Amino acid sequence: MDKIVLICATGRSGSTTLQRIINIIPNSNICGENFGAVNSLLEFYRRIKTTTFEYVPGHLRPASYEDIISKNVKPSWYNSYNFQQTVSMIKMLIASLFKNSETTNVWGFKEIRYDNGNINYIKEFKELFPETKVIIQVRANIQAQSQSNWFKKDKNALQYLNTLNNEFYNFYNQNKEWCYFTTFEKMFDKANVKKIFEFIECQEHYDENKIKQILDNNIKD
């Protein structure tokens, strides 16, 4: 079975470096950001699920248009899609974005667009792919983070990051069995990185030398 790994992070928290570290695993393909596109697919899944189970006459076996009309029911929620088939297509689309070959057996992506409660989309991802493991990465020193790149243009950056870190930590606390919480600062802690590899069940591929090379080579934007 494939191993699916998501890196859910705040901006300027070292998520790209963590992505590079995970990608030392043979046959892995942890992609970069997708501008929250996967969130949109998960929103679609969330909405089609609500439509199916709360509104569509017949739910998983939608009533025909003729049957609805014959019972003098307003067809405002009439639908003809197959829910299970629709879910399968969503899963196939998501997998096709990141599983780039038949031999790829560790795949996923990293994303930073999880503010305003969007971290909760990961629950839908977990429903679709129960084998998913999530690494949540923030930066402990939000003072320095708030002065990095685009954040330094936002006078409310410090408050924003503090709120976001709390949201991420609360999400982790609610889902500890499949989430690992870490920080930018802990990427330089060998024991912590080793635990991450153990968490995603790839401990045999932990390579201290390769990881050091990545940490020593900070690719600039």
Q: What feature does the model see in each segment?
A:
Residues 98-206:
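PAPS-dependent sulfotransferase catalytic domain
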Residues 1, 94, 108, 170-173, ...:
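Polar low-complexity intrinsically disordered regions
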Residues 6, 10, 16-18, 96, ...:
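Short, flexible coil/linker segments at or flanking structured domains
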Residues 85-95, 165-170:
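Catalytic alpha-helical scaffold of carbohydrate-active enzymes acting on polysaccharides/glycoconjugates
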